[in-house]
Structures are given as structure tokens and as C-alpha cells.
């Protein structure tokens, strides 16, 4: 098994606490409203804390698909949230698990900087596919921007 680590950063005009609330605390409600392709977010196991598994159902290529998302850690005081993709179409056959360690910090002009570390654990001696990595980054960028756009369009959300 190999572990491959990547880091990325997103900037937003939304304040860190407000963005965190939308991305973590109210995610099950906000994400399907903000991200056009996501139909639903539902808890399939757990109570919403670490260890909880959520099913995100979305439309891709005209078909309904899903990913299983496991909450690894929630750190409200430091605006941190760690989760893993543990099943569904978001996990190619060569990948054991994809983990995301996220943290929001204060950005310019009251906005946010989202810092994310992505760890891909492969099965056997498989190597991550570069195209899959680029596609995953593009989905992450689009997701983050969709949440930011939703919050900008709904300034009363807090």
C-alpha cells in the first residue's frame, strides 16, 4: 500500500466561522441547496460526530450515484474537519481510502483561506492516476465555489 499526499488551498470572501458552519455544522441541509448536482446528504451510520458515515447522492452523466463519506474528526474551536471517502463511485478500485484534513483560517478582508491536505491510500503497489487527481481537484474547487456562491446569495445565513 502506498500513501500519496497532496496539499491545496482555497480562498473565499466568506468569513471563516460562517463558511465552517455551512460546510460542517449545516452541511446536510446547505450542500444539496448549494451544489446543483448533489441530490441529498444522509447519515447512514452514527450520530453526526466522528465515526459517522454519510451518503452523498449526486447526478453524474445523467445517472444517480453516491459516495460514502466518513467523518474522522471535528474541531469546531479551530475550524477543522477531517473526513474520508470510504466507498461509492468516488473510490476507484485501486484506492483503499482518500482522506481530507481541512482547516479554515482568516483570509484577507474578513474572508477565509481553506487549507486541505489530501491523502490517497492505494491498494497494493498501485499508483494514483494523475487524471483522476486533476478531476478530483476540479470537483473540490467547484464544490467550494458553489458553497461560497450560495452564501453570497443568502447574506442572512448565519
Curated annotation (Swiss-Prot):
Binding positions (trans-zeatin 1): 8, 83
Gene Ontology BP term (one): defense response
Any Pfam family hit: Bet_v_1
Transmembrane segments: none
E.C. number(s) listed in UniProt: 3.1.27.-
Main localization category: cytoplasm
Positions contributing to melatonin binding: 83
Cellular component terms per the entry's GO annotation: cytosol; nucleus
Entry keywords, A to Z: Allergen, Calcium, Cytoplasm, Hydrolase, Metal-binding, Nuclease, Pathogenesis-related protein, Plant defense
Gene Ontology molecular function: any one: abscisic acid binding
Subcellular location: Cytoplasm, Cytosol
SUPFAM superfamilies assigned to the protein according to its UniProt record, in alphabetical order: Bet v1-like (SSF55961)
Residues reported to bind Ca(2+): 32, 35, 38
Record family assignment: Belongs to the BetVI family.
Free-text function comment from the UniProt entry: Class II ribonuclease (RNase). Binds to several cytokinins including natural adenine-type (e.g. trans-zeatin and kinetin) and artificial urea-type (e.g. N,N'-diphenylurea and N-phenyl-N'-(2-chloro-4-pyridyl)urea) hormones. Interacts with melatonin.
Name of protein: Class 10 plant pathogenesis-related protein 2B
Organism of origin: Lupinus luteus
Organism lineage string: Eukaryota, Viridiplantae, Streptophyta, Embryophyta, Tracheophyta
Amino acid at each position: 500500500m502506498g500513501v500519496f499526499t497532496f496539499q491545496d488551498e482555497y480562498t473565499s470572501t466568506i468569513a471563516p466561522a460562517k463558511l465552517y458552519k455551512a460546510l460542517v455544522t449545516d452541511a446536510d441541509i446547505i450542500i444539496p441547496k448549494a451544489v446543483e448536482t448533489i441530490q441529498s446528504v444522509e447519515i447512514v451510520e452514527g450520530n453526526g460526530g466522528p465515526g459517522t458515515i454519510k451518503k452523498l447522492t449526486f447526478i453524474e452523466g445523467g445517472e444517480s450515484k453516491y459516495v460514502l463519506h466518513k467523518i474522522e474528526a471535528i474541531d469546531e474551536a479551530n475550524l477543522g474537519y477531517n473526513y474520508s471517502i470510504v466507498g461509492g463511485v468516488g473510490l476507484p478500485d485501486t484506492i483503499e481510502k482518500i482522506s481530507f484534513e481541512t482547516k479554515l483560517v482568516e483570509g484577507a478582508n474578513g474572508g477565509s483561506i481553506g487549507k486541505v491536505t489530501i491523502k490517497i491510500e492505494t491498494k497494493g503497489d498501485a499508483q494514483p492516476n494523475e487524471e483522476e487527481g486533476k478531476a478530483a481537484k476540479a470537483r473540490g474547487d467547484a464544490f467550494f465555489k458553489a458553497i461560497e456562491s450560495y452564501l453570497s446569495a443568502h447574506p442572512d445565513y448565519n
